[in-house]
Amino acid sequence: ETIDRHPDFRIIAAANTWGKGADLQYVGRNALDAATLDRFDNIFFDYDRKLEECLYPSEEVLKFMWSFRDAVLKTKIPHVVSTRGIGKVYKKDQRGIPVNDILTSNVVKNLSQDDVNTVIGNMSDINSSNKFYSGIKQLVLRR
């Protein structure tokens, strides 16, 4: 039996890659064949800052994490600064976890010292009154 597609039917699929399989950031992915890729249009969705503001209402966390994310993108250093990651920083800050512990376990994890220095050097629209920014600068000096 053939079932006709409803005129309003749409399929939306999401992926962390462009269909070419594993890379350095997403190692557990498989490539899709050309016929499958041909059936879909690629639409890039960036992180939604308004959603992040609603979920994690801390100007200090958001300003730091957005500046850090922007610097990562600007420098093309392969490092993910996701909404989920911002949430982890926010929740740990709310629980009173020390800033340096948050930075080490959730922000600069898996980055080399050179990459951290490069990212920090490219952060903008933030100043040392932000406890995360001053903390990361101190962390760099101790690493």
Where are these regions (language model features)?
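C-terminal regulatory/interaction module of P-loop NTP-utilizing enzymes
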Residues: 1-143
